[in-house]
């Protein structure tokens, strides 16, 4: 069906990655497990984007383990325009932050910034900003940012060990999902207008 093929090349494709999964729980705090929260928000983002006629590819839709290289391959093989990896934080601090590659272009930075701005309108404890590289080294990127071929970012949706962040996450799950989706669409309208029918 050539029509479908043509249609797909003219439609934005977004890969949503629910961090961790399966044998990899991610962070844990007082019985709360990161892999469960990331899947909840990822499925909600998928649902919202599909309601906006955006083509969505998921790295996982259930509690399974994929290596980071496999997550990148899923996005790359789908020729996704954006790759958004959803996580929860842990440690000292509170609020939401995004991470991009230290060589990220304007589009990836805009994606990360737009996500924070949209989440801020819903309500987050603190906007911790867009960060580059990784915690240990500003020039050493997280694998999902390093090995994906498209504009990408990691979103750390509050700290698992901070009650206020957990409450915000639970009470605003669908609103957070819509905010992330709207930020992706807003970025695409600027940088991928042809795929948005503009």
Question: Where does each model-flagged region fall?
Answer:
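Polar low-complexity intrinsically disordered regions enriched in Ser/Thr and small residues
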Residues: 4-6, 29, 161
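Glycine- and acidic-residue-enriched helix-capping/strand-helix junction motifs
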Residues: 25-40
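Short, surface-exposed beta-strand segments enriched in small/polar/acidic residues
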Residues: 14-28
């Amino acid at each position: 069906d050539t029509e479908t093929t043509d249609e797909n090349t003219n439609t934005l494709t977004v890969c949503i990655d629910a961090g961790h999964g399966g044998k990899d729980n991610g962070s844990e705090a007082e019985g709360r497990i990161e892999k469960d929260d990331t899947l909840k928000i990822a499925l909600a983002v998928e649902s919202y984007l599909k309601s906006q006629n955006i083509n969505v590819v998921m790295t996982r839709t259930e509690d399974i383990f994929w290596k980071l290289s496999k997550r990148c391959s899923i996005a790359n093989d789908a020729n996704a325009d954006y790759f958004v990896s959803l996580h929860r934080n842990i440690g000292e601090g509170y609020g939401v932050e995004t991470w991009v590659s230290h060589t990220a272009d304007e589009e990836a930075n805009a994606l990360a910034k737009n996500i924070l701005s949209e989440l801020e309108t819903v309500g987050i404890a603190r906007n911790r900003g867009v960060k580059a590289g990784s915690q240990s080294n500003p020039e050493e990127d997280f694998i999902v940012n390093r090995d994906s071929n498209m504009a990408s970012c990691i979103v750390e949706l509050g700290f698992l060990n901070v009650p206020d962040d957990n409450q915000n996450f639970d009470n605003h799950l669908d609103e957070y999902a819509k905010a992330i989706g709207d930020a992706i669409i807003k970025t695409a309208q600027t940088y991928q207008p042809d795929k948005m029918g503009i």
